[in-house]
Amino acid sequence: MSGKKAAARLMIQGTSSNVGKSVLAAAFCRIFYQEGYHVAPFKAQNMALNSFITRSGGEMGRAQVVQAQAAGLEPDVRMNPVLLKPTGHTGSQVIVLGKAQGTLSALKYHGDYQRKTWPIVEEALHELLEEHEIVVIEGAGSPAEVNLKQNDIVNMRVAKEAQAPVLLVADIDRGGALASVVGTLELLEPEERQLVQGIVMNKFRGDIKLLQPALDFLEERTGIPVVGVVPFYDQFKIPEEDSVVLEEQNTSKRDQGKSRDEALDVAVIRLPYLSNFTDFDPFEDEPDVILRYVREPSELGEPDCVIIPGSKNTLSDLRFLWESGLGEKIIKFWQEDVPIIGICGGYQMLGRIVRDPLGTESDLKEIAGLGILPMETEFELDKHTVQSRGKVVGGELFLARCQGTEITGYEIHMGRSQGEGHSLFEIEAQETAYGDGMSAGSAVGTYLHGIFDNDPLRTALLEWLWERRGGTRPVGETMSQAAIREQSFNELADWVRNSMDMEKIRAMMGLHKG
């Protein structure tokens, strides 16, 4: 033993999915970071279509990337050693320590394979505990799923291994929060229940005085203190974990009330297997943009720009475009000179054909693309995952405004595309230089996720779209994405800190009062 003081731990578990665990974990990461601690996030297993590529080329869940940024750290795949990316209703691609291991059915994964990943999870957890002063751990779903408990590697088994005090979070905005807390605790084993040292009511609306009798009841019934009631607030500009947030509405709350006269209309196709929709978060931060997600042709209207996003199942989503009529509508828009942008899987769909002879994504062997870009794509077994850096070299459309501009992004794809056009970007990644992207008429495609996080490129696009309307952009210079992110982390930390009994939380963690 090195004699080094053991890291303090705190684990956030929930009564169900989507109660706010990821955001609260990010808040605690920033709170402790502000207090001068060296803090790291950890989630043993995540299931999400939003992923990120680390500097070393490893793939991990976006939520832990956000938490790492809140903690002032470079993302590390050990923070999310197991990532499941759904490829269909019953199967997922399994990614372990950043590398794809293949696609398994839910039944096969929750059997032997999940048990085999526990030593990897265990090692990653203990390494982070050795290297940091505090580790903020996030659970998944609910710890009371009795049908999954036998092979659990993400909830109470992690809490026991880390000897971490657990905060149990309920979403009171949904209703039934008291029953969900009591029911969850009733279904836990006695030794698991002892680990739960605090209850948090999240997303509360109204006067807390009216809630106090319920809080008193919870404490008396469970013997566990309520350590926080976090008021509802949905304006934090923190990237969301998964596309469940898109199910509630097709237009961002930040965009409601904007008229088409004062804002550009950007329509993103809501693919069934849409991935990395955080690519479009920068548009939500622009005061002159309305960002919409559309599922069918009738919802498209007359957008200033149509974006086909990334996909975890490109061939199936391409089939969806054809069967829904969206494919024909997009082609018609392109013929009418409406700007069309494809990102990763969306880029592949813009080509002439997509082939998957080895069945890497689905049972479909090939399907006709939209035929807008002069290229063809074929899927291979090897997954290309890199952080990319480069510059704009293609002079088409809005890119003519930012020639030579340096850009960053990341790539996650198994398809290789070949075509006749000139590259739009000159990329350097892992000591290799290559071209990326293609354009034809009003259409542009690229493999780069995160492309719109590049402030000069995004600004060039928006100015170009306004000029196409016959006007000039009505807003001046806006905050950079980096500045917006930092401001949001600090606001989130203040919001949560002021809603929590931080003295009790520090005490359960073994920390002195900050």
UniProtKB/Swiss-Prot annotation:
<dbReference type="Pfam" id="PF07685">
    <property type="entry name" value="GATase_3"/>
</dbReference>
<dbReference type="GO" id="GO:0003824">
    <property type="term" value="F:catalytic activity"/>
</dbReference>
<keyword id="KW-0315">Glutamine amidotransferase</keyword>
<dbReference type="InterPro" id="IPR047045">
    <property type="entry name" value="CobQ_N"/>
</dbReference>
<dbReference type="InterPro" id="IPR004459">
    <property type="entry name" value="CobQ_synth"/>
</dbReference>
<feature type="domain" description="GATase cobBQ-type">
    <location>
        <begin position="263"/>
        <end position="457"/>
    </location>
</feature>
<feature type="active site">
    <location>
        <position position="449"/>
    </location>
</feature>
<comment type="similarity">
    <text>Belongs to the CobB/CobQ family. CobQ subfamily.</text>
</comment>
<protein>
    <recommendedName>
        <fullName>Cobyric acid synthase</fullName>
    </recommendedName>
</protein>
<dbReference type="InterPro" id="IPR002586">
    <property type="entry name" value="CobQ/CobB/MinD/ParA_Nub-bd_dom"/>
</dbReference>
<comment type="pathway">
    <text>Cofactor biosynthesis; adenosylcobalamin biosynthesis.</text>
</comment>
<dbReference type="InterPro" id="IPR033949">
    <property type="entry name" value="CobQ_GATase1"/>
</dbReference>
<comment type="function">
    <text>Catalyzes amidations at positions B, D, E, and G on adenosylcobyrinic A,C-diamide. NH(2) groups are provided by glutamine, and one molecule of ATP is hydrogenolyzed for each amidation.</text>
</comment>
<dbReference type="GO" id="GO:0015420">
    <property type="term" value="F:ABC-type vitamin B12 transporter activity"/>
</dbReference>
<feature type="active site" description="Nucleophile">
    <location>
        <position position="344"/>
    </location>
</feature>
<dbReference type="InterPro" id="IPR029062">
    <property type="entry name" value="Class_I_gatase-like"/>
</dbReference>
<dbReference type="GO" id="GO:0009236">
    <property type="term" value="P:cobalamin biosynthetic process"/>
</dbReference>
<dbReference type="InterPro" id="IPR011698">
    <property type="entry name" value="GATase_3"/>
</dbReference>
<dbReference type="Pfam" id="PF01656">
    <property type="entry name" value="CbiA"/>
</dbReference>
<dbReference type="InterPro" id="IPR027417">
    <property type="entry name" value="P-loop_NTPase"/>
</dbReference>
<keyword id="KW-0169">Cobalamin biosynthesis</keyword>
